[in-house]
UniProtKB/Swiss-Prot annotation:
Disulfide bonds: none
Chain residue ranges for the region called Disordered: 1-98
Stated name of the protein: High mobility group nucleosome-binding domain-containing protein 3
Compositionally skewed regions (Basic and acidic residues) per UniProt: 1-25, 39-52, 61-71, 80-98
Length: 98
C-alpha cells in the first residue's frame, strides 16, 4: 500500500497537487453590498398547562376489571357468530315482506 504524501515532503510533479490553495476572493461588487439583515424571529406562543389537568392513565398493558366487564357485552362475537345473527335477521325481514 503506498504511503501518504505530506505537503512538507512533496517532490517533483506531485508538489503542485499537494500545495495548499488560497481561498478564492469575493468580487468587489459582492463585497460592496452589506449583508441583508436577518428577520427577527417571531415569539412562539406557549400554552400554559394546569398541573392538575393530567389524567391518570394507569399501568401500561393492564386493563381495569371495570373496563373489561363493560367491553364484554359490546364486543362483536368471535368466529363469525355475529354474521350468522345478522343473516337470520335479514331472512326474517324478507319473510315478513312476502
Amino acid at each position: 500500500m503506498p504511503k501518504r504524501k505530506s505537503p512538507e515532503g512533496a517532490e517533483g510533479k506531485d508538489a503542485a497537487k499537494v500545495t495548499k490553495q488560497e481561498p478564492t476572493r469575493r468580487s468587489a461588487r459582492l463585497s460592496a453590498k452589506p449583508a441583508p439583515p436577518k428577520p427577527e424571529p417571531k415569539p412562539r406562543k406557549t400554552t400554559k398547562k394546569e398541573p392538575g389537568t393530567k389524567a391518570n392513565k394507569g399501568a401500561k398493558g393492564k386493563k381495569d376489571e371495570k373496563q373489561e366487564a363493560a367491553k364484554e357485552g359490546t364486543t362483536p362475537s368471535e368466529n363469525g357468530e355475529n354474521k350468522a345473527e345478522e343473516a337470520q335477521k335479514t331472512e326474517s325481514v324478507g319473510d315478513k315482506n312476502e
